[in-house]
C-alpha cells in the first residue's frame, strides 16, 4: 500500500494511526502542500491521484485509489478485520463513529 500523506495533516495522521494499530505495512509518499516550496498537491501528477488535491490518498495493494480519511479507515477495517478498530457491540460502534465524525468535521 502507498499512503500519499503530509506530515502535518491531521487527516493523514488518522490514517497512519489506523495503519499502525492494524500492524499494516505501507509506503509513505510525502506530498508537500506548502507553496512556494511545494504545492505538489496542485500538480497534474497528484491531481491524477486525487482530483481534490487533498491528502490522504491510499493506493491499495490491488492498485485501487481511495481518498478521504474516514473512507480509507473504513476500507482498512473491512479489508483487514484481524485487528479490529471498532468494538463488536452495535451501539458502541455507532458511538465510536459519532466521535470520529466530531473529530473529522468539527475539530
Which residues fall in each region the model found?
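GST-like domain detector, emphasizing the conserved glutathione-binding G-site
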Residues: 1-107
Amino acid at each position: 500500500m502507498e499512503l500519499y500523506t503530509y506530515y502535518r495533516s491531521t487527516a493523514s495522521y488518522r490514517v497512519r494511526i489506523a495503519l499502525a494499530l492494524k500492524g499494516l505495512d505501507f509506503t509513505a509518499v510525502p506530498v508537500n502542500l506548502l507553496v512556494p516550496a511545494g504545492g505538489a498537491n496542485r500538480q497534474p501528477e497528484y491531481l491524477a491521484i486525487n482530483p481534490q488535491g487533498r491528502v490522504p490518498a491510499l493506493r491499495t495493494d490491488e492498485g485501487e485509489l481511495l481518498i478521504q480519511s474516514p473512507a480509507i479507515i473504513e476500507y482498512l477495517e473491512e479489508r483487514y478485520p484481524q485487528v479490529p478498530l471498532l468494538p463488536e457491540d452495535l451501539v458502541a460502534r455507532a458511538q465510536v463513529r459519532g466521535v470520529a465524525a466530531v473529530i473529522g468535521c468539527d475539530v
